């Protein structure tokens, strides 16, 4: 396992952001490494997942999960190794999936840990395609979207960890998949690597016209995780009985007020009514936690058979977590964002 560090670095929430997070909202602290008590394990973080939902946990507005306290460690999924164990089910060296957050070390009771096996080939993938983002894509599309062969599926943030997986599952189910991404490079990746039929740059001046042309038969499923102007362009293209799984609204996470322009709610509600549209939000852990094994079995097989392609963007060093997270919210990432906190020896 290598020599144990003598101090634990941790990023805490220094202040709540007003609008987009800034470096001053975070503070790096150091303290002594805790000693595990009876029935506990000491974990060393190897990989830390950075995800858009963390922005919501920085605010104190009512939500589906409690906010991070001022001075509290920033939340986050992690892949760790057991350093010391007073728990019968865990031994030093074990690989585990957990929620240690933005820090080098953590004490766990073991209740929220999942073993990853003795020698996982790609342990960080448990934070992406084989973890929460992949699970979100899988359940949102298959349970709420219910794709049928020949239908048109539109996926925003097409090269992100959720969108990329949604589109590829859609192709496996026989859909025409239209991706939406920011920039030509991401669009090329969506079509040439991920297998999307079309991918459109939402920065284009004529984006709405391009989308209408790409969906001549309308839109049967719109997988929503961004919101904003993209939804405005999709709305008039929705077919009768269209389905809209909603797993996130990244475009509004930093908003401090409603966007300018006319009230869009009457048009949305009229469209939902007249076209009998299913518009459903979901929180993956709370709504589908009981189906995790179903996902792991099928997604694991797809990945093994190279039917699902996956891209990571790994940044080395816990010290880089805040700036990398800020970039994630600005759409600078290309694939799943992971911080490599320590080596895997």
Stretches with model-predicted labels:
Residues 74-81, 92-157:
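NAD(P)H dinucleotide-binding glycine-rich loop of Rossmann-like/cofactor-binding domains
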Residues 206-216:
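Short amphipathic alpha-helix with an adjacent loop that forms part of the alpha/beta core around
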Residues 95, 152, 176, 242-243, ...:
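Short glycine-centered segments of the SAM/dcSAM-binding site in methyltransferase folds
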Residues 229-308, 341-345:
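Glycine-rich phosphate-binding loop and adjacent beta-alpha segment
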Residues 127-205:
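Mid-domain Rossmann-like dinucleotide-binding core that forms the NAD(H)/NADP(H) cofactor-binding site
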Residues 32-50, 58-102:
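Glycine-rich beta-strand-centered segment in the early N-terminal region that forms part
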Residues 97, 154, 200, 222-223:
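N-terminal Rossmann-like NAD(P) cofactor-binding module of classical short-chain dehydrogenase/reductase
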Residues 2-6, 286-345:
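C-terminal hydrophobic helical "lid"/dimerization subdomain
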């Amino acid at each position: 396992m290598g020599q144990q560090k003598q101090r634990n670095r941790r990023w805490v929430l220094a202040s709540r952001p007003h609008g987009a997070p800034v470096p001053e909202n975070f503070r790096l602290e150091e303290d002594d490494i805790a000693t595990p008590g009876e029935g506990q394990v000491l974990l060393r973080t190897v990989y830390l997942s950075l995800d858009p939902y963390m922005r919501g946990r920085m605010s104190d507005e009512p939500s589906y999960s409690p906010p991070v306290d001022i001075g509290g460690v920033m939340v986050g999924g992690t892949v760790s190794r057991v350093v010391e164990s007073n728990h019968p089910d865990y031994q030093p060296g074990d690989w585990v999936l957990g929620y240690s957050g933005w820090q080098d070390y953590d004490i766990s009771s073991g209740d929220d840990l999942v073993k990853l096996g003795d020698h996982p080939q790609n342990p960080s993938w448990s934070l992406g395609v084989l973890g929460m983002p992949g699970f979100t894509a899988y359940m949102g599309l298959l349970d709420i979207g219910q794709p049928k062969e020949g239908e048109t599926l539109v996926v925003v943030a097409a090269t992100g960890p959720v969108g990329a997986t949604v589109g590829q599952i859609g192709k496996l189910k026989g859909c025409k998949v239209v991706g939406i991404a920011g920039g030509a490079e991401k669009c090329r990746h969506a079509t040439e690597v991920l297998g999307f039929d079309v991918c459109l740059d939402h920065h284009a001046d004529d984006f709405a016209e391009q989308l209408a042309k790409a969906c001549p038969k309308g839109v049967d499923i719109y997988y929503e995780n961004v919101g904003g102007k993209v939804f405005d362009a999709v709305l008039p293209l929705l077919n009768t009985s269209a389905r809209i799984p909603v797993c996130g609204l990244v475009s509004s996470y930093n908003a401090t007020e409603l966007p300018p322009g006319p009230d869009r709610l009457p048009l949305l509600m009229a469209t939902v009514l007249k076209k009998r549209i299913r518009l459903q939000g979901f929180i993956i852990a709370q709504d589908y936690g009981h189906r995790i094994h179903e996902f792991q079995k099928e997604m694991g097989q797809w990945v093994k058979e190279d039917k699902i392609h996956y891209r990571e963007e790994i940044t080395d060093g816990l010290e880089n977590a805040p700036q990398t997270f800020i970039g994630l919210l600005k759409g600078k990432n290309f694939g799943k964002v992971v911080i490599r906190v320590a080596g895997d020896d």
